């Protein structure tokens, strides 16, 4: 989305508020409550309140304002962000060994996101519904069922897209942030002493007074910055400037006022710790606040769901996940997609989490490990980009990295204390996704190498066919080829078994470039290899979906006329068997076979009419 048009800047900034800041914007529902709930051995004490408020404020300044908005967002790939984009950028100008390490870091970061995405909708919606405990305590047994009902409706509407309701996200979230600010300001006016916590010395004093316990307590403070990765991941939708403008003009002031307002309330009434957010509001405003809190958390959950759809598409297009059905829910916005398999797997996982943990406080114990782990990886990858791509001074880059890690590593280490109380959940889910992605990528590479290791020269084969042609039949045949200079398996098997060839043969390769989009001018490259053979290479970005009909249209513009319903598409279908392997590689091979069996078939991937496809099978040992 462009920000060149100044008249559209307010609208884009408002849209960014509605999408980008949903997760971090709903953190006040539970963050301070978890910090001062007594789990760390101290209750609502003045020094503890001031210490936590100071830590939260300066964490928002350093991590969000300085690290992500100022530094990390400089690293973009044609305007796009995200951990896999950062991985790609970092590996451009490094050695093969270093690139491999950076790829592993990027995949771990992406896997961590899958781990956290299960918790975010659950903790956000449950925190809002728990306002019932204040409004009507007798309804507290309905918190889990109502949370499941709300999220069920949210996941059910995904297939219809969010274009219509999405227009309401921005005004609702703007209203939410204004309410955060208003409630906080009202409380601060009644007890302005709390503003002393803006002094970072209160954070230092907190560590000196509470010593080891204060370090463990960082695991609760990190709840205030969950969702920070969304700022970078959504950069391509809104642009850097609108996201930064929204943060500094609306989001940061609102969050600061609300956190400090909760602190002022707790200094005056320590018993409000049971739910300091909702107790900020007067009695008459509790029900409206509960409703808009529920809406805000649904929007935050929607942003996370959309984020996992986008990450999955990117991973599929880059070859780290098996092909799956991706449905575009908007004709106007290519970023609005729906992936049925991911949607319902995520829904089942979220429901299981809600039923198992029962309360947002229990979920808070599971939150943070994956977030802070991703922060560490982002620091390393982004500073690598600064050194290798931007050619910044190595000592300056080292200082930046040290500064980032001095914050990231303590936060990550403190969250390891949550491992047994729930932190195992996102780590386990992330580990599973990492194994799946690395298995698909490595086994796919092994398969393609196996299929092509004994291949003959494409040029030599074409020359031989032109010199001693087989029986030629009228029409055009397209052979899908994964590599440009390799003879397609389907072509070899057609000649071997049918001993015929069409009058016109097109070898079509669809490849993904290291960019989000490819300009239409560069979409198709056509090369005539002989009087009857053509090579067509169609390039797509990882945010685009390949479409053979579009490729044919581009070919027609270049002089190679093709009609979809008059063309035969020949594809190979591999029947895979496992060869002799060590037990651990055999397990990985079995996982790959499972993924391969459930992968979307090529005709469905590229929107080729099924009645125009001929699949030729071949058995391959891996």
From Swiss-Prot:
Localization in the cell: Cell inner membrane
Keywords, sorted A to Z: Cell inner membrane, Cell membrane, Ion transport, Membrane, Potassium, Potassium transport, Symport, Transmembrane, Transmembrane helix, Transport
Activity modulation comment: Uptake is inhibited by protonophores such as carbonyl cyanide m-chlorophenylhydrazone (CCCP), but not by valinomycin.
Chain ranges on the Cytoplasmic side, renumbered to this chain: 1-8, 70-102, 158-164, 234-246, 297-336, 384-395, 440-622
Main location: membrane
GO cellular component terms attached to this protein's record: membrane; plasma membrane
Reaction it catalyzes: K(+)(in) + H(+)(in) = K(+)(out) + H(+)(out)
GO terms of molecular function: potassium ion transmembrane transporter activity; potassium:proton symporter activity
InterPro entries xrefs: K+_transporter, K_trans_C, K_trans_N, Kup
Topology relative to the membrane: Multi-pass membrane protein
Pfam families (UniProt xref): K_trans (PF02705), K_trans_C (PF22776)
GO BP annotations listed: cellular response to cesium ion; potassium ion transmembrane transport; potassium ion transport
Function: Responsible for the low-affinity transport of potassium into the cell. Likely operates as a K(+):H(+) symporter. Kup is probably the major potassium uptake system upon hyper-osmotic stress at a low pH. Can also transport Cs(+) and Rb(+). In the absence of potassium, Kup-mediated Cs(+) uptake partially supports cell growth, however, at a much lower rate than with sufficient K(+). This effect depends on the maintenance of basal levels of intracellular K(+) by other K(+) uptake transporters.
Family (UniProt): Belongs to the HAK/KUP transporter (TC 2.A.72) family.
Protein name: Low affinity potassium transport system protein Kup
Species: Escherichia coli (strain K12)
Phylogenetic classification of the source organism: Bacteria, Pseudomonadati, Pseudomonadota, Gammaproteobacteria, Enterobacterales
